[in-house]
């Protein structure tokens, strides 16, 4: 007797539906993705994932950053998926940047209850302009006397302490803040992007800038030099209300695009998150520079004597050449790259030791870094010095007379006398620079040199001027004669 198990009608319907769903789920295997389907590569290319990409080595990619900086201004919708976000700002308008503490419990306990220092900068985004940044900013200062590129709107800011703006650094501001308290700083950018374009005929595109923030903690000496975190974002600055018009124009252009074209662009975000970057190279090492205004003062007045009075300050040591050594570790090589303004390539060369970098040929570095940076890196690796604008050779007359007299007493021929000259290298070609170089040569203070003369025709004494030095022939030789001044303890020097 055959037994047959019959399912209820409802169970049969459920079983049939499950079979159809399973068949449908298998039917797409081996087929191409249609227009309505998606791939994981497209998902990973979305801006939310792209903005989280780190510019640091892989071992640091998964770490949570201690701080986060958020610029309260919308990003442009006309930026492609794989490009960095771009934010439009109005000239002179105050924009909030929120300083957020992202530390986990127990992270960086040494700054608990203490202040940190943040330095804000507006710098060029284009590498071409970075090379001439000093000249560009000096030109802006000349055209806009009394104005600054970057300012803090102090009345609107919250939680900032001791805000400062160096009068010589128009694009930099700094302040202290407590990470445990709410901190928001309002900044104003006063230059517009079109002020730095090469040709100004109207309608040209403005150059992009970067807002960079470097944060430091206090060291044992009370100086804020230990780097904690750096981040930056790309901006363009327009005349008042120009940023709003540009944002509206970009939005209207995107609305006219097809859905397929829109998928290639990032959506516009209400705020701009600054992404982590390398620290500004000059900041980390700024305190290694000697203090300005330090003058040596010795009482002796002969070349190479070097026995100054103990009551005066010793002569400052010569600057140490920052040459990369073959024995340098990869960590030391990274520090050397940052000090010499090659931070862009620090990740590329993160596993290179000093010997590895020094083995690179000129063609190697040009191929890796491009022509401009490649040549600069090659010259830095080889320690090539810039040729001075003017070189002169000097010898002290008293030494010559002593040697001539000694030769005469010994009965030797005068023509066999050997004189020692000292090289002086001039860059600025000014009388002040020559005075300082001669003071160093004689181991005295530059204030002890009253005047410098050049012996002219018929023995006349011509006062040295900037124009005269600029007309010196390169590698000219001079004999120095010194005379005591009648009024004080200074000296006159005569070039013969």
From Swiss-Prot:
Pfam families linked to this entry: CP2 (PF04516), GRHL1_C (PF25416), SAM_3 (PF18016)
Record key words, sorted: DNA-binding, Nucleus, Transcription, Transcription regulation
Domain Grh/CP2 DB: 61-300
DNA-binding as annotated region, ranges: 133-386
Signal peptide extent: none
Annotated Gene Ontology cellular component terms: cytosol; nucleoplasm; nucleus; protein-containing complex
Tissue: Expressed in the epiblast at the pre-primitive streak stage. At the primitive streak stage, expressed in the extending primitive streak and in the prospective neural plate. At stages 7 and 8, expressed in the neural folds, somites and in the regressing primitive streak. At stage 12, ubiquitously expressed in the whole embryo.
Principal location class: nucleus
Coiled-coil features, chain-numbered ranges: none
Keyword Transcription attributed: yes
Places the protein is found: Nucleus
Gene3D superfamilies registered for this protein in UniProt: Transcription Factor, Ets-1 (1.10.150.50)
Compositional bias segments (type: Basic and acidic residues): 241-265
Single GO BP term: positive regulation of transcription by RNA polymerase II
Location of region: Disordered: 238-268, 296-327
Similarity section: Belongs to the grh/CP2 family. CP2 subfamily.
PANTHER family, per the entry: ALPHA-GLOBIN TRANSCRIPTION FACTOR CP2 (PTHR11037:SF11), TRANSCRIPTION FACTOR CP2 (PTHR11037)
Function, as annotated: Binds the B-response element 5'-CAAGTCCAGGCAAGT-3' of the ENS1/ERNI promoter. May be the major transcription activator thus being essential for its expression.
Stated name of the protein: Transcription factor CP2
Organism: Gallus gallus (Chicken)
């Amino acid at each position: 007797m055959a037994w047959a198990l019959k399912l209820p009608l409802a169970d049969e319907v459920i079983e049939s539906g499950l079979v159809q769903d399973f068949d449908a789920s298998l039917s797409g295997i081996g087929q191409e993705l249609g227009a309505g389907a998606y791939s994981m590569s497209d998902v990973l290319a979305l801006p939310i994932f792209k903005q989280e990409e780190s510019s640091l080595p892989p071992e640091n990619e998964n770490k949570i950053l201690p701080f986060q900086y958020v610029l309260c201004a919308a990003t442009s919708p006309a930026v492609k998926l794989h490009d960095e976000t771009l934010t439009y700002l109005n000239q002179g308008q105050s924009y909030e940047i929120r300083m957020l503490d992202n530390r986990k419990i127990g992270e960086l306990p040494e700054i608990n209850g203490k202040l940190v220092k943040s330095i804000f900068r507006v710098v060029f985004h284009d590498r071409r302009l970075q090379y001439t940044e000093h000249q560009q900013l000096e030109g802006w200062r000349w055209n806009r006397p009394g104005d600054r590129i970057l300012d803090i709107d102090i009345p609107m800011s919250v939680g900032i302490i001791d805000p400062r703006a160096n009068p010589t650094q128009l694009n930099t501001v700094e302040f202290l803040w407590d990470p445990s308290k709410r901190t928001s700083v309002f900044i104003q950018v006063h230059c517009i992007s079109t002020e730095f374009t090469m040709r100004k005929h109207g309608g040209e595109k403005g150059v992009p800038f970067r807002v960079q923030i470097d944060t430091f903690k206090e060291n044992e000496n009370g100086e804020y030099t230990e780097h904690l975190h750096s981040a930056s974002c790309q901006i363009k600055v327009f005349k008042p209300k120009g940023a709003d018009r540009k944002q509206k124009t970009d939005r209207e252009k995107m609305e006219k695009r097809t859905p397929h074209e829109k998928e290639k662009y990032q959506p516009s975000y209400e705020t701009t998150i600054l992404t982590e970057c390398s620290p500004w190279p000059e900041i980390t090492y700024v305190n290694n520079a000697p203090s300005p205004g330090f003058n040596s003062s010795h009482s002796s007045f002969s070349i190479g004597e070097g026995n100054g009075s103990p009551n005066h300050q010793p002569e400052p040591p010569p600057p140490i050449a920052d040459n990369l050594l073959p024995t340098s570790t990869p960590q030391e090589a990274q520090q050397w790259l940052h000090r010499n303004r090659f931070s862009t390539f620090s990740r590329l060369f993160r596993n290179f030791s000093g010997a590895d970098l020094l083995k690179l040929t000129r063609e190697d570095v040009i191929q890796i870094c491009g022509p401009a940076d490649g040549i600069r890196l090659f010259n830095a690796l080889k320690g090539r010095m810039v040729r001075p604008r003017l070189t002169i050779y000097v010898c002290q007359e008293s030494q010559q007379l002593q040697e001539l007299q000694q030769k005469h007493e010994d009965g030797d021929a005068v023509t066999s006398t050997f004189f020692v000259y000292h090289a002086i290298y001039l860059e600025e070609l000014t009388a002040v620079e020559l005075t300082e170089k001669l003071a160093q040569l004689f181991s005295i203070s530059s204030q002890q040199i009253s005047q410098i003369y050049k012996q002219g025709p018929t023995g006349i004494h011509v006062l040295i001027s900037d124009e005269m030095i600029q007309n010196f022939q390169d590698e000219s030789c001079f004999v120095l004669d010194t005379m005591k001044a009648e009024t004080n303890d200074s000296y006159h020097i005569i070039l013969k």
